[in-house]
Amino acid sequence: MRALFFGTSEFAVPSLRVAASHTELKGVVTQPDRPAGRGQRLTPSPVKRAAGELGVRVYEPLRMRDFAREIGREPFDLFLLASYGRILPKELLTIPRVGALNVHPSLLPKYRGATPIQAALRNGDRETGVSIMLMDEGLDTGDLVMSRRVAIAAGETYGELHDRLALAGAELLGEALDLTERGDLPRRAQRGEGSVTRPLAKEDFAVDLSWAPHRVVNLVRSLSPKPAARATIEGESVKILAAHVGDDGELVIDELIAPNRGRMSGAQYLRGRGLA
């Protein structure tokens, strides 16, 4: 099967490797290099780096409709997507013979959109999952091919759950590609009431330590290790990396980053400021 893979973030890398082993991968489409780090140097996406290791041609289109015209004459069976970060226009979706399969880290139709992993943790969900869908022009509204439930461990952070879902999604993509090869790819409309997540903004990082302890802990988990929840303790802004609810029901800050002092335990921080 001739395929083109679309992806950008670290989440997509395991799926890219599955695509490379299950299809005749003709190229990888990713977002252009972006400034990163303190020096703001142009940095390739994780998917671009992985594509280089695989020796696969990389495309970095700025205008998707122009890109559709560029590749529209080539015979593709499948487009495969995981965490690409852009919606594909109709001009692209109509190119592949079978369609465009997308790996999404939630049990659709719940948590469509940009931040499904963070939403599941922030809301204190005990399970989430991964879904493979056939894309349409909407935001994660296409027909479902298959999905798999994934339990969320107590205290699990965004970084930990992200990595587990990336692997689970890649495994499920491999199963979907095997079914496609046999001509047995299932599909059904999404059922139930959907919900949509949006990209995170700076105000989403702020935590008020007067909130209920479980609410604070869930927000901290959803943002750890990066970008990290921000809180103000006696006039000083800190990044909270880990917290839990103690036996007495009170909030316990386990780890934080303090200005000019780096990473430390919550107890160390409070002692150092004479607050404990």
Enumerate the language-model features and the residues they cover.
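Donor/substrate-binding cores of folate-linked one-carbon enzymes
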Residues: 20, 78-196
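Active-site-proximal cofactor/substrate-binding loop regions of enzyme domains
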Residues: 2-8, 28-31, 37-127
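A short beta-strand-loop-alpha-helix capping motif that often carries His-Thr
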Residues: 190-204, 237
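An anion-binding loop in the catalytic cleft
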Residues: 204, 209-276
